[in-house]
């Protein structure tokens, strides 16, 4: 022992006292720190360290969780988390791709809607006179002529249309000799066609009674007269009404009952009599 102390420097009593106090405090601190480290090793729970906010030199306990690191129950929908603007969650990948895909889908749906809902024409085609029934009133010198015609109506739209009514009249020598109107006829499906037969009753009398002699003349086999047929078809779709009108001249035999072969006439039609 003496040999070991011979190498120690000599100090004053004051310094020796200070060193003694320092050594004692260091020993105590070492024991305290050792106990703390042992407790940390045993528990291994880091939750005992409070959550604090560092604001430079000082630190402030988090007011939300009160330093516990746990959010109070029932406040999950009331608290807002702040994240940096540069966080990748604010800039998800493929955003442009999703936006472009959404725009493309919207444009595609709009284009399809315009294509299928865009109004197209409704074609009215006269097929010909189907039959003509003739009767006479000899005393009144009157001719009764009922003309049945065939009309094709084609719907070129991708939705159904309603044929609301068909009106027609027949003129002979600039005089109206017959009228007819047919209501609530039928519905035509998308890209479909329907054929409609209708009859217009006509009367040739009074100032045109001279035609009675012509139509009953036995020396003539064919008693054709020229009649002007006027027809108007009214269709509706999506609350919109559309009218299609046509007029043509038709040869009709007023001397006998006649049945015609459809497709051989180039003239127009008329319809069923008004009620």
From Swiss-Prot:
Entry keyword Acetylation = no
Localization of this protein: Late endosome membrane; Lysosome membrane; Cell membrane
Kindly list the GO CC terms recorded for this protein.
late endosome membrane; lysosomal membrane; lysosome; plasma membrane
For this UniProt record, the keywords arranged alphabetically read as follows: Cell membrane, Disulfide bond, Endosome, Glycoprotein, Lipoprotein, Lysosome, Membrane, Myristate, Signal-anchor, Transmembrane, Transmembrane helix, Transport
Disulfide bond sites:
215-254
Report the glycosylation sites: 146, 152, 165, 184, 257
Q: Name one GO molecular function term.
A: ATPase binding
- Report quaternary structure and partners: Can form homomers. Interacts (via N-terminus) with MAP6 (via C-terminus). Interacts (via C-terminus) with the vacuolar-type ATPase subunit ATP6AP1. Interacts (via N-terminus) with AP2M1 and CLTC. Interacts with TMEM106C.
Organism of this sequence: Bos taurus
Pfam families per UniProt: TMEM106, TMEM106_N
Q: Where is this region: Disordered?
A: 1-24
Lipid-substituted positions (N-myristoyl glycine) = 2
Know the name of this protein?
Transmembrane protein 106B
Q: What does this protein do?
A: In neurons, involved in the transport of late endosomes/lysosomes. May be involved in dendrite morphogenesis and maintenance by regulating lysosomal trafficking. May act as a molecular brake for retrograde transport of late endosomes/lysosomes, possibly via its interaction with MAP6. In motoneurons, may mediate the axonal transport of lysosomes and axonal sorting at the initial segment.
């Amino acid at each position: 022992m003496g040999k070991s102390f011979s190498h120690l420097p000599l100090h004053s009593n004051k310094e020796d006292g200070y060193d003694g106090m320092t050594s004692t405090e260091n020993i105590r601190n070492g024991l305290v720190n050792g106990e703390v480290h042992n407790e940390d090793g045993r528990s291994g729970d880091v939750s005992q360290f409070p959550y604090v906010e560092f604001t430079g030199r000082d630190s402030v306990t988090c007011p939300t969780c009160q330093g516990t690191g746990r959010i109070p129950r029932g406040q999950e929908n009331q608290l807002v988390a702040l994240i940096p603007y540069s966080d990748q969650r604010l800039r998800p990948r493929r955003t442009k791709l999703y936006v472009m895909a959404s725009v493309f889908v919207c444009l595609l749906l709009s284009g399809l809607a315009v294509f299928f809902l865009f109004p197209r024409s409704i074609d009215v085609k006269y097929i010909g006179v189907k039959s003509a029934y003739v009767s006479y009133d000899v005393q009144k010198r009157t001719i009764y002529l009922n003309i049945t015609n065939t009309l094709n109506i084609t719907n070129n739209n991708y939705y159904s249309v309603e044929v609301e009514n068909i009106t027609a009249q027949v003129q002979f020598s600039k005089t109206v000799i017959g009228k007819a109107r047919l209501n609530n006829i039928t519905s035509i499906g998308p890209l479909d066609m329907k054929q409609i037969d209708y009859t217009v009753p006509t009367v040739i009398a009074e100032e045109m009674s001279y035609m009675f002699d012509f139509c009953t003349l036995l020396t003539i086999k064919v008693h054709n007269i020229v009649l002007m047929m006027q027809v108007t078809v009214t269709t509706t779709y999506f609350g919109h009404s559309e009218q299609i009108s046509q007029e043509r001249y038709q040869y009709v035999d007023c001397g006998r009952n006649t049945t015609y072969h459809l497709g051989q006439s180039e003239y127009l039609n008329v319809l069923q009599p008004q009620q």
